[in-house]
Amino acid sequence: MIILDNSIQTKKRTDSLSKLITVNTLGPEGTSSEYAAKHFISNFTLLQGLNSKLSLHDTFESCIERTLQSPLEYTIVPHAYDGIKHFYMRPDLQLLQIFRCDTPMYGLAVRPDFEFRDDMLDTSVIVSHPSPINLIKYFTRKDVRFKLVNSTSQAARKVKEGLYDIALTNELARQKYGLTFVKTFKSIPMSWSLFGKGDVDDEN
């Protein structure tokens, strides 16, 4: 659902109809951001007849730097990301659209051969992206320790590699890295912002 529709063809962007546009967001594969970006491409860019591709990055800040390089580069950021507030303030960025796309299911994932017990939450370190960590508080009532990483997919990968035993991650990353959910929480209702290059250079 598009809440704000300032079509990405506006403000001198009519060339995007014939050229390839890039939608940037947080990677690696398996992130909720990738899921939302694919949703956006399927439900907006393709319906508008736009040629588009998806590009995944290590941080949202890296996505923004790419967006600032070209009017054909865009960035999708979830409103749960704390750093999004800085993007709204930048004169060289513009907010183009806001849309809703709920995340995949979130839960605690382990390797298939790992024997999980509930009391491990009192002592183990859970690897997670910062944004969803309150799921642990609300669903388990536990005060756990976290190792914070850049994405939910990266959290799952670290468990797959044996660096940690428990990840707070989503269903896509769980499948990608062959993990098993020992607890499931919820699909998070989420809204997202689409940013494009601003017109600050044209005004100066």
Curated annotation (Swiss-Prot):
UniProt-recorded Gene Ontology molecular function terms: carboxy-lyase activity
Keyword DNA-binding part of the UniProt annotation: no
SUPFAM superfamilies (UniProt xref): Periplasmic binding protein-like II (SSF53850)
EC number: 4.1.1.100
Catalyzed reactions: prephenate + H(+) = 3-[(4R)-4-hydroxycyclohexa-1,5-dien-1-yl]-2-oxopropanoate + CO2
Entry annotated with the keyword Repressor: no
GO cellular component, one term: cytoplasm
Gene3D superfamilies: Periplasmic binding protein-like II
Induction of expression: The compound guanosine 5'-diphosphate 3'-diphosphate (ppGpp) is essential for the transcription of the bacABCDEF operon and BacG, and GTP regulates the transcription of both this operon and ywfH via the CodY-mediated regulation system.
Pathway participation: Antibiotic biosynthesis; bacilysin biosynthesis
Domain of life from the UniProt record: Bacteria
GO biological process, one term: antibiotic biosynthetic process
Subcellular location: Cytoplasm
Family: Belongs to the prephenate decarboxylase family.
Entry function: Part of the bacABCDEF operon responsible for the biosynthesis of the nonribosomally synthesized dipeptide antibiotic bacilysin, composed of L-alanine and L-anticapsin. Bacilysin is an irreversible inactivator of the glutaminase domain of glucosamine synthetase. BacA is an unusual prephenate decarboxylase that avoids the typical aromatization of the cyclohexadienol ring of prephenate.
The protein, known as: Prephenate decarboxylase
Biological classification of the source: Bacteria, Bacillati, Bacillota, Bacilli, Bacillales
